[in-house]
Amino acid sequence: PIIEFTRALVPEGKNIHAFERDGAKPTVTKVANHNELHEHITAKVAALQTEQHNTIAIICKSAAESAAAYEELSSIEDIKLVKSTSAEYEQGIVVIPAYLAKGIEFDAVIIYDASKDVYSNESVRRLFYTACTRAMHELHLYCVGEVSPFVLGADSDSFELITTP
């Protein structure tokens, strides 16, 4: 299900040959504000840990967004911030900018804010695609406000849209 979803994120996606990953259909959760975003991500991380996912990445667009997200999510036990100066990648729960996640795979990936405000410029489409394809088994996208147009280009059957009350 993840590959089907991510192929639709880039124009040449149908030509991409990737290994199929087992796992659930990706979810896209719309939240009203950043407080709600942090509550939902904290709860999702706890659920993923219960499901025995050993590597969980919260992927952000930039290093600045990663640092801010790390501060807001610091209540999550053993969470780590990966920076360009990090000596090596550590397993567990990490907050990481998308450009540093390239080449690394995680059991579960949470896209920190896949909103139109963050991911709508064509220049970041490949970065968004790269972030989403880091997931081996579970992919969860969260949006504060409107969903990224990149997501809206995917077949609505390829993901589950969740709108919080």
Where are these regions (language model features)?
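Short, hydrophobic alpha-helix immediately C-terminal to the catalytic nucleophile
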Residues: I3, T42-A43
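Short secondary-structure boundary/hinge segments and terminal tails
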Residues: T27, P149-F150
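Conserved coupling/interface region of RecA-like P-loop/ASCE motor cores
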Residues: P1-N33, A63
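Core RecA-like ATPase module of SF1/SF2 helicases and allied nucleic-acid translocases
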Residues: E20, N35, E39, A46-H140, ...
